[in-house]
Each structure stands twice: as C-alpha cells, then as structure tokens.
Amino acid sequence: PAPYYQCVFDHRLFDLFHDALKKTRQLFTLEDRPFGQSIKLLGGDGFSWDMEEGIYSGYTISYFALQLAVYMGFKKIFFLGLDLKHDGHNTHFFGQDPQTINHEKTEFPRMIKMLQHGANVLADTGIKVYNCSPVSTLEAFPKISFGDAAAL
C-alpha cells in the first residue's frame, strides 16, 4: 500500500521514483518540485512550528519531516533508518551518489547539529522523538528498538 505521508525534497527522487511518489496520498516537498504539497523553504538553520510560514531544511529530509510531524500534532515521533553513516559504497538508500561521497565530513556534521537543535527545541514540549535505528551516529534522540517503539 502507498504511504499516507511522505517527504521528499531531492529533485533526483522525483525522477527515480516518479510512479511510487505519485501514489503517495500526501507528499510534502519544497517549492519548485514537479508535484506534491509544496512548503516554502526558510533556510537551513532554524525550527518552524508553522508550515504555512515555511520550513527549515536542517540539511536533511529527516529534519524537514520532524518539523512537519510536530506541526501535524504528533506527540511521539520515531526515526527509522536514520544512521547518518555510509554503508560501504552506498551513500543513500537508493545506492551510491558520487556527489555525496564525503558527506560524513561535510554534510553529516551539519545534519547532526540541526537534529540536536530540534531535540533542544522540543525538550520541554512533551513531544517525544526516538531513534529506532540500531546502528546510528545520531545521539540527539533516545535510541530504542523497533519492537519497543511498537509497544509504546
């Protein structure tokens, strides 16, 4: 079945997964993408509580999705597959991208900084964010197993 909600802002994914993305019930993306519910990009650093004003990229779709989930009213948010590390030659879930081979030194530190910022912003709100990725360099959110997450 098609996912209810999906977030994509990488232009390449609209070409690679065009048919699958078209089947998504609610696709959230940035302005100037071929289709989907577009949200104005406010910049890289910051945290948006109101998608009508816009969203911050945090340099990763995970940060985009975090803000969107908060805006939608979710009180428990679970990250799965957010490892922020390369697995051998693969740089992304869809394989290798030569343009991002150095992400661990260039982009990952910015992503980690912003995800930590998100954790700090949400610390006293009652919104709980969990990292269900068994192998992950991200320490901003408590790590729990997928089984424990499903039991919450």
Predicted regions span which residues?
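Metal-ion/cofactor- or nucleotide/acyl-coenzyme-handling active-site neighborhoods
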Residues: 1-152
